[in-house]
């Protein structure tokens, strides 16, 4: 679910942004943007010159200098406004989160168990390791892990999703977020962070932090813009002695106007806004990025590691068939499979119990009365089961059961291998059931590939992004599903160690890797990946290891994250192209006007036939300021994104923003020149 989007020019945000734009005229704020700092200095210099001219301290046209000075200040204000508006939109999103933070009291337990004596303490005094009790209608006072109990939790204040979720002790759904509300039952929670370090605190700080760190690409582009600015500064500085030697020295006001029109002020004024807006768009998709660096990395990703279940398939694998080994009755296999699944709360485990009930009327046994020992599934063992009445029953992946059988002195039957291959070739997942060292047979689990996913992978492939399916299934099943879904590669029988090794392998090849995860066992791989999207429903360890958190806990969101990242990079590249192309057109307006008196031959460059030198220079300066405002919507919303190859994207960029950057100034400056002339302002 996405958050409600703010209108692009929300009146309250515009007013606040205008106030902030004026505050940002402070030289300390301007220094952070070298290109606009040059414009700020030029504005100050021309203001002083116009005052001196008005006071007859200096010769010259005071009105013309004042007009140039005024529009240079407007240029700086518009650049400040673009950044302030982008920041204001992010802060507005953060304010909705601030409303979740409530000063409340918590029941701090003296012992880590339900029913223990409790002390009433302010929620903001809870420390990491404290144990609290929350009951129906209570606000959860801190981020933490559920150590006892289970409850329905309303997380809409953070995720925007109205449907309640279940949080319970054990497994990957034990993580809770401070500020959410208990709807029913109770939880005993161990706080996992100190005050000021909660997930909500980090979200708010991230979206409204004034000191946003620049990303590597942003730094590289800033260096390029500074280099261009220095080149134009030196070139402009040399023009005065040339014109003076020619007998008609160009005024400092005109030289400043020339410099401002030639340096890349358009992208210089919008660069910060593009970065802030990219993070804001990510938040609009209900994904929290810990930094702009993470959003930028998403745009550069060329390998996606996608979990099969929930991302590529619908994730509701159901037991469809019991296939007994030679000499074993199907009912005996079903009975053992049901016993091994009684404590398995996964959808697959419940479906095995139900299938046994439907096929052979095997009623679900009372777990408490069995006096059995249940063996939970782990990523390392890849088995689960039950020990009951001297019977040791296990179900799990083929390789895991094979190792288990051989470790217990048994032999894995060849006919079961054939049955496993048959199930796998059909795209189903085979689970093998064993009692002691005797293999009883195979359970077939069927899953369905999501509609339209193959087309989405084809689009990613066109963009040069490799898709890799991660699954715990055996190689045959994985290969069948990979072929059906259209992924480029797959990792079968995946373990946390195997995922980590695969990420490192791709990174060693110079690739950037993105993945999702929700469990504690995903934390090492999430920490290693370049873009790591942790599920909000996952464990605290997973959320701390990732550099993004998906509030909707939707693994498919990873593809959208990559799209948003690429859109931000495309927006930056497109506006840079437009800005530099702009400079070429402004060259034809201002150079002839500034130097035609000294070098009449330059009149040949006056292809726009502007009214007079003063109107030409003023028109170029006005256009230079106004174009920033006209491009603010594009900077905030991003350019339209289409999955294309890199070469096709470059061609499209050059045609639209390169050619557009050349033509728009010719039209704009000519129109402004006509208006100034008609109104008698020059």
Curated annotation (Swiss-Prot):
The chain crosses the membrane at residues 34-54, 62-82, 219-239, 254-274, 588-608, 616-636, 656-676. Its EC number is 7.2.2.6. One of its GO terms (molecular function) is ATP binding. InterPro entries: ATPase_P-typ_cyto_dom_N (IPR023299), ATPase_P-typ_P_site (IPR018303), ATPase_P-typ_TM_dom_sf (IPR023298), ATPase_P-typ_transduc_dom_A_sf (IPR008250), HAD-like_sf (IPR036412), HAD_sf (IPR023214), P-type_ATPase_bsu_IA (IPR006391), P_typ_ATPase (IPR001757). It is a multi-pass membrane protein. It is found in: Cell inner membrane. It catalyses: K(+)(out) + ATP + H2O = K(+)(in) + ADP + phosphate + H(+). Keywords: ATP-binding, Cell inner membrane, Cell membrane, Ion transport, Magnesium, Membrane, Metal-binding, Nucleotide-binding, Phosphoprotein, Potassium, Potassium transport, Translocase, Transmembrane, Transmembrane helix, Transport. Pfam families: E1-E2_ATPase, Hydrolase. ATP binds at residues 344, 348, 377-384, 395. PANTHER family: POTASSIUM-TRANSPORTING ATPASE ATP-BINDING SUBUNIT. The system is composed of three essential subunits: KdpA, KdpB and KdpC. Part of the high-affinity ATP-driven potassium transport (or Kdp) system, which catalyzes the hydrolysis of ATP coupled with the electrogenic transport of potassium into the cytoplasm. This subunit is responsible for energy coupling to the transport system and for the release of the potassium ions to the cytoplasm. Belongs to the cation transport ATPase (P-type) (TC 3.A.3) family. Type IA subfamily. This is Potassium-transporting ATPase ATP-binding subunit. The lineage of its organism: Bacteria, Pseudomonadati, Pseudomonadota, Gammaproteobacteria, Enterobacterales.
């Amino acid at each position: 679910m996405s958050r409600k989007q703010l209108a692009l020019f929300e009146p309250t945000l515009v007013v606040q942004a205008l106030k902030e734009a004026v505050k940002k005229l402070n030289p300390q704020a301007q220094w952070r943007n070298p290109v606009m700092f040059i414009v700020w200095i030029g504005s100050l210099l021309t203001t002083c010159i116009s005052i001196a001219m008005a006071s007859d301290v200096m010769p010259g046209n005071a009105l013309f200098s004042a007009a140039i000075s005024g529009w240079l200040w407007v240029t700086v204000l518009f650049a400040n406004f673009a950044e302030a508006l982008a920041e204001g939109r992010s802060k507005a999103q953060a304010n909705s989160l601030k409303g979740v933070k409530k000063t409340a009291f918590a029941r701090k337990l003296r012992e880590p168990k339900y029913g223990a004596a409790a002390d009433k303490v302010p929620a903001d005094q809870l420390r990491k390791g404290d144990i609290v009790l929350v009951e129906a209608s209570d606000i959860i006072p801190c981020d933490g892990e559920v150590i006892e109990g289970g409850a329905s939790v309303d997380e809409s204040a953070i995720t925007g999703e109205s449907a309640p979720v279940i949080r319970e002790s054990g497994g990957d759904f034990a993580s809770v977020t401070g500020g959410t509300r208990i709807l029913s039952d109770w939880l005993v929670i161990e706080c996992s962070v100190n005050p000021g370090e909660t997930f909500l605190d980090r979200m708010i700080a991230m979206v409204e932090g004034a000191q946003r760190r620049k990303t590597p690409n942003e730094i590289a582009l800033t260096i390029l813009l500074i280099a261009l600015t220095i080149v134009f500064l030196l070139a402009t500085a040399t023009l005065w002695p040339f014109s003076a030697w020619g007998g008609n020295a160009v005024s400092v006001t005109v030289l400043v106007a020339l410099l401002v029109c030639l340096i890349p002020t358009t992208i210089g004024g919008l660069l910060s806004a593009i970065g802030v807006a990219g993070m804001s768009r990510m938040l609009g998709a209900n994904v929290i990025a810990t930094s702009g660096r993470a959003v930028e990395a998403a745009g550069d990703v060329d390998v996606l590691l996608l979990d099969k279940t929930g991302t590529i398939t619908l994730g509701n694998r159901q037991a469809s068939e019991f296939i007994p080994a030679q000499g074993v009755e199907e009912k005996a296999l079903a009975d053992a499979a049901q016993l091994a699944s009684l404590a398995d709360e996964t959808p697959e485990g419940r479906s095995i119990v139900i299938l046994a009930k439907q096929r052979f009327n095997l009623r679900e046994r009372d777990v408490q009365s069995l006096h059995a020992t249940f063996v939970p599934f782990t990523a390392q063992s890849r088995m689960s089961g039950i020990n009951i009445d001297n019977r040791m029953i296990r179900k799990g992946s083929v390789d895991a059961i094979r190792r288990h059988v051989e470790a217990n002195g048994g032999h894995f039957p060849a006919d079961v291998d054939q049955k496993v291959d048959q199930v796998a070739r059909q795209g189903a997942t085979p689970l093998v059931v064993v009692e002691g060292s005797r293999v009883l047979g195979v359970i077939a689990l069927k899953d369905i590939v999501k509609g339209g996913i193959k087309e989405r992978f084809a689009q990613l492939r066109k963009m040069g992004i490799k898709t890799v399916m991660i699954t715990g299934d055996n190689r045959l099943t994985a290969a069948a599903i990979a072929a059906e879904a259209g992924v480029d590669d797959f990792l079968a029988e995946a373990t946390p160690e195997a995922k980590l090794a695969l990420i490192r392998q791709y990174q060693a090849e110079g690739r950037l890797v993105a993945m999702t995860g929700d469990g504690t066992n995903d934390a090492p791989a999430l920490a290693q990946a370049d873009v790591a999207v942790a599920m909000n429903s996952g464990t605290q360890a997973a959320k701390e290891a990732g550099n993004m958190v998906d509030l909707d806990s939707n693994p498919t969101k990873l593809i959208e994250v990559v799209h948003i990242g690429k859109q931000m990079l495309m927006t930056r590249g497109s506006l840079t192209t437009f800005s530099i192309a702009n400079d070429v057109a402004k060259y034809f307006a201002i150079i002839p006007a500034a130097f035609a008196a000294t070098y009449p031959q330059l009149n040949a460059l006056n292809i726009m036939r502007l009214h007079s030198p003063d109107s030409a220079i003023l028109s170029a300066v006005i256009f230079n300021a106004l174009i920033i405002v006209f491009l603010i919507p594009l900077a905030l919303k991003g350019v339209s994104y289409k999955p294309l190859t890199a070469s096709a994207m470059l061609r499209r960029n050059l045609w639209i923003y390169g050619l557009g950057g050349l033509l728009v100034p010719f039209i704009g400056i000519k129109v402004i020149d006509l208006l100034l002339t008609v109104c008698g302002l020059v």
